[in-house]
Amino acid sequence: MNTTNKQLTEELNNTESNNDHNDFAENNIINLKQLKRKLPEELQVQAEELKIENISSLLKQELVFAILKKSVEQGGLIVGEGVLEVLPDGFGFLRSPEVNYLAGPDDIYISPSQIRRFGLRTGDTVEGQIRAPKAGERYFALLKVNRVNFEDPAKAYHRVHFDNLTPLYPDEKLGLELENNSKDSKDFSTRVIELVAPMGKGQRALIVAPPRTGKTVLLQNIAHAITTNNPEVFLIVLLIDERPEEVTDMQRSVRGEVVSSTFDEPASRHVQLAEMVIEKAKRLVEHKKDVVILVDAITRLARAYNTVVPSSGKVLTGGVDANALQRPKRFFGAARNIENGGSLTIIGTALIETGSRMDEVIFEEFKGTGNSEIVLDRKIADKRIYPAIDITRSGTRKEDLLVDKIILNKMWVLRRIIDPMGSSEAIEFLLKKLENTKTNCAFFEMMKSPERPRNGL
């Protein structure tokens, strides 16, 4: 171990000393991540300036590769970043979230010796200086490792494996409440969630949703609340088997990492993307970071696993293979609060009432695995009341660890008041009360003491 640490220190020292050689001007340093974020039109303009031929026939990844190669020929320095995928042969590639972790010509090769030296695993976010392909090579290669998971590379060597970390109930609240300055009922969705099913860091939550009940908008509102109130949280939105226009809408409305696999892609692609996302999240949690993954939808992910898993010969009701749900359950079960720092929160949607027996079986299998549930009601949505949350059927386990005792008592009083009502009347009643206040604290101030619950509001 001492020898390994010595080699690691020498490597880091070499990295620092080598950073000084080739003193390029600022405009000669190309950031690969920023380059990939550019629009195709902007890349074409840059390619024309570099006098690259046949631009119109190149895909975006091929265009990025051509720009990088030409820039290196003209004396440029390239700094790249990506998420490591280690292949069975021992070497790996840095995949880019900008292209949904698809393999492409602009991926960065990492040698087996570098992977061993820094203790890297699939899912590690690696940043460093890269070099152009030599004669006979196809890919750019990592020259120096500057950071691993946004920290010093030496820290990656001493981290504890995710499976060895101790899981606990969530005990730190994930703030979702946003002040309301309009009377648009959609604005109250996160406030309603705070009242009926508060979320904590490390929560494993299911949004149970029939079709057309506003689950996508609800996810967008949750994502916006998380990025606004919890800037320390690393947010990933994972869209599986989704419509392309919904992907674009989510990318433009969410300030976080949005990765997707659309319905026209094979099931193996859905699975590969989900595995990359969960491995990346685990590596960040090992570095004591708080990560939130919003998944739309867990049901479609389970369908994809059912397609790619080798047949066991045992088929359950609805055509679900007996072994198909083990891996999506492992994905969902990775959500946990970690003792001594770090958490992984997963909020996923489960589809019901789709007319598919398979979807019902998948939902029943996942039903008891979460520790928080938000149930959407089709009857409420048909009345165009949003959020279409069924208050009486929604809730969080061990909510007393997340909410102050006085507030918790008032939340229970609220539940006793709305319990005799129907689901539609309950949400209408609550929204009407929330319209008169900007925050939930102000709403609770309107409530009288818990001794008289029937006249509480």
UniProtKB/Swiss-Prot annotation:
Class in the EC hierarchy, top level: hydrolase
UniProt GO cellular component terms: cytosol
Binding residue positions for ATP: 200-205, 212-217, 243
The entry's keywords: ATP-binding, Helicase, Hydrolase, Nucleotide-binding, RNA-binding, Transcription, Transcription regulation, Transcription termination
Limits of the Rho RNA-BD domain: 77-152
Similarity annotation: Belongs to the Rho family.
UniProt-recorded name of the protein: Transcription termination factor Rho
Species in which this protein is naturally found: Rickettsia prowazekii (strain Madrid E)
